From Swiss-Prot:
Species of provenance: Shigella boydii serotype 4 (strain Sb227)
Designated name of the protein: Protein SlyX
InterPro entries (UniProt xref): SlyX
Pfam families: SlyX
Gene coding for it: slyX
Signal sequence region: none
Region Disordered, annotated ranges: 52-72
Bias type Polar residues, positions: 55-65
Family (UniProt): Belongs to the SlyX family.
Amino acid sequence: MQDLSLEARLAELESRLAFQESTIEELNVTVTAHEMEMAKLRDHLRLLTEKLKASQPSNIASQAEETPPPHY
């Protein structure tokens, strides 16, 4: 009787392990897909930031363009 319960417990553990391995593999695929998507989004964000900076002139004048303060 003891052997049967040990065999049943072992079978249950093996079944759980198989499901866990399957779940881990699915999660790995999902995480990998998310990492790839995030890399694409980072690239798009970088490009959009560069375009935005290029299209907007800076409101801050360079030191050569600045007029000296009135007390000079």
